[in-house]
Curated annotation (Swiss-Prot):
Biological role stated in the UniProt entry: May play a role in ciliary/flagellar motility by regulating the assembly and the activity of axonemal inner dynein arm.
Any GO BP: cilium movement
Coiled coil: 34-143, 175-233
Recorded family membership: Belongs to the CFAP73 family.
Keyword Phosphoprotein carried by entry: no
GO molecular function, a single term: dynein complex binding
Annotated localization: Cytoplasm, Cytoskeleton, Cilium axoneme
Protein name: Cilia- and flagella-associated protein 73
Taxonomic lineage of the native organism: Eukaryota, Metazoa, Chordata, Craniata, Vertebrata
This protein's encoding gene: CFAP73
PANTHER family: CILIA- AND FLAGELLA-ASSOCIATED PROTEIN 73, COILED-COIL DOMAIN-CONTAINING PROTEIN 42 LIKE-2-LIKE-RELATED
Domain of life where this protein originates: Eukaryota
One Gene Ontology cellular component annotation held by this UniProt entry: motile cilium
Keyword flag rRNA-binding: no
Amino acid sequence: MAVPWEEYFRLALQEKLSTKLPEQAEDHVPPVLRLLEKRQELVDADQALQAQKEVFRTKTAALKQRWEQLEQKERELKGSFIRFDKFLQDSEARRNRALRRAAEERHQAGRREVEALRLWTQLQELRREHARLQRRLKRLEPCARLLEQALELLPGFQEVPELVARFDGLAETQAALRLREREQLAELEAARARLQQLRDAWPDEVLAQGQRRAQLQERLEAARERTLQWESKWIQIQNTAAEKTLLLGRSRMAVLNLFQLVCQHQGQPPTLDIEDTEGQLEHVKLFMQDLSAMLAGLGQAEPAAPAS
């Protein structure tokens, strides 16, 4: 920071000297005096510069100290902000924990209240059940005395529960026998109803079977007639097929004879197979066409001969 200020003062001194040189040039001052004046001006300027430098150093030190104080305050403020932020975060965390604990306590209190209500209801039900059992016990006291008397009369049983178990077994057996009896009676009634239905439906069934037998007999007779008709048609078809086969054989023999005659007329040996009837017919057809063309040519040549 000192170099720019020194440059500034040096430039200011040069400007000041440059402004005074013309004025001094006008005056006729001896060179020695001018040199002394210049030295004095330089000394004054240097003193002024040193004074300004001292002031500048003082201000710079003060500013530096001020900056350090400001930086220290800034660091302190940042630390305060950090501590305050941490304090706020801790406070918020404590508040959230307190809210969660309060909510959990309310929830637990609600659950405890519900559990207490359930237990109280269960207690009331148990009390009612106890009262009902007490009333039943009072009603069953005569039965208990009666069972004890019966146990004295029955030496085969040592305890009342044995007698009660035996009685329960007999009661269950009796109930099972009664159920089985009802089921058998129901089956018997169903069998009787089915037998009566069969007896009632027997005449109708016999009549229906007779009608069905007559229908089947009619269908059998019709089938026999159709069989005879088809047999006669089959014989007729066989006869017709035999006639067609005989006619086909004769036709094939005639075609073979014609083919052989044509080959003999042409002086050529037969080259086609005996079973190739179509080829033989085609050969005879070509021969007949050639012969017809030849005869037609002869018919046209005979009238032309007398004219010549």
